[in-house]
């Protein structure tokens, strides 16, 4: 499968995975900053979001994956990631964020709202960037 860097897909997955890392390097970081701003608009703990982002944004095999995940964990006071099972094999991974509280089912709509506000900020930023060229 494209994007997989483990056997038996390594021969066809390594180049697409690395290309994805390069192409999404800036968008991942911009998205993290937009998510932090969205958290501020929603009254979430932006200081914790920034602190966890600075500390945990590199705690993933992909250089881009933990960017927004770390902001989200900090904003909501959650501990995310950690060990995971893939295809019957346990992969030991670092945690992202602090376990300030237990994850509950109420966190699902909170994260959905956070993602929606982040996406709206991205849309506004895109429109603002395009506006000078439209005139």
What are these regions (language model features)?
Residues 3-135:
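Hydrophobic alpha-helical transmembrane segments
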